[in-house]
């Protein structure tokens, strides 16, 4: 499957569909069946239950020898609790090497303080989850394919976002650089709120779209959310100024705000207006480099149409990973896992999903 054939819609969690009745669990356990606790199961019920439990155990199997070898090969730089020195302290029952801090006395492993801390599912399951993201699967289809609980996909995605924050820092394009802004509609509730405010003031409706500044030099790219209003000179310079090398050639559509970037970086300007390029074939369009990225970005975000706009930059960081770095998907998985092992980020499940507003 490719990203072109994996477009689906995931329902956005809302106060209405997330409402929890008192005393009733929010989500059904994968090991819970309508006939659980009843005597005399039918043959069909027994077969279904045995199959699902087998799936469950497969997803929660013990780490493979290769996974244990990988984890035990990671050498912590310091105690994740206090930053002190440490010594080896044998192995845990799972086979993972344990360490003990010489200063605070706490014990830990190479995974302590990372997104894999206190994991219940083998790290190897992340490979399939990441591949689904790279192939433009929605969270809903990924949860179904992986037989995960409804919140698992969102919980893991929050971990992916945490690891990728800052991944675009330091990206600088040079040579021939194409730029343009991509617009995403605000959700219906935000549009209605913006309309009410504009009607009260008697002006134009604003704040109904999110702007993303995009750039590419044909090899690398960047995607930076500028806000809910059309970026002016200051916002353009903030988005593009640190990400384009001086004296490069800027290929753009003549947007007025681009002039601030051109002047500040002494760029050569090559303008192709929308009137000029309208109706052109892709191979003839001088802005095809940036238009192609916009097209892929649109398809990617459409696969996750229920996303929270407050996390739009996180989604752009994930899209950056898809369109930059190693071309091979397995190399991207390797790249991500190695980043995750090295970053001390811990996100507790209880903090994300433990409390539901009534």
What are these regions (language model features)?
Residues 2-358:
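Residue-level recognition of single "structural anchor" positions
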């Amino acid at each position: 499957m490719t990203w072109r054939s994996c477009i689906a819609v995931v329902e956005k969690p809302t106060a209405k569909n997330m409402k929890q009745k008192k005393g009733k669990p929010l989500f059904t356990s994968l090991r819970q069946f309508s006939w659980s606790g009843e005597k005399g199961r039918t043959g069909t019920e027994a077969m279904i239950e045995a199959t699902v439990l087998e799936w469950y155990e497969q997803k929660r199997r013990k780490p493979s020898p290769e996974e244990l070898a990988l984890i035990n090969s990671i050498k912590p730089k310091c105690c994740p609790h206090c930053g002190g020195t440490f010594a080896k302290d044998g192995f845990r029952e799972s086979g993972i090497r344990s360490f003990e801090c010489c200063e605070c006395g706490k014990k830990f492993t190479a995974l302590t303080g990372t997104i894999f801390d206190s994991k219940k599912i083998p790290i190897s399951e992340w490979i399939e989850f990441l591949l689904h993201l790279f192939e433009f699967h929605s969270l809903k289809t990924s949860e179904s394919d992986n037989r995960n609980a409804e919140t698992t996909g969102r919980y893991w995605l929050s971990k992916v976002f945490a690891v990728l924050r800052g991944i675009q820092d330091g990206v600088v394009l040079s040579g021939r650089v194409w730029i343009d802004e991509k617009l995403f509609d605000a959700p219906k509730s935000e549009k209605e709120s913006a309309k009410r405010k504009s009607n009260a003031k008697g002006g134009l409706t604003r704040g109904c779209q999110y702007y993303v500044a995009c750039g590419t030099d044909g090899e690398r790219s960047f995607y930076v959310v500028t806000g809910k209003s059309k970026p002016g000179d200051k916002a353009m310079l903030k988005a593009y100024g640190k990400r384009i090398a001086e004296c490069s050639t800027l290929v753009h559509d003549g947007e007025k705000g681009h002039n601030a970037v051109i002047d500040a970086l002494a760029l050569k300007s090559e303008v192709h207006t929308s009137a000029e390029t309208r109706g052109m074939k892709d191979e003839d369009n001088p802005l095809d480099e940036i238009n192609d990225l916009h097209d892929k970005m649109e398809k990617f975000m459409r696969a996750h149409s229920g996303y929270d706009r407050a996390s739009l930059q996180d989604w752009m960081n994930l899209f950056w990973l898809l369109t930059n770095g190693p071309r091979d998907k397995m190399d991207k998985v390797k790249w991500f896992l190695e980043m995750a092992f090295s970053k001390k980020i811990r996100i507790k499940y209880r903090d994300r999903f433990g409390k539901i507003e009534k």
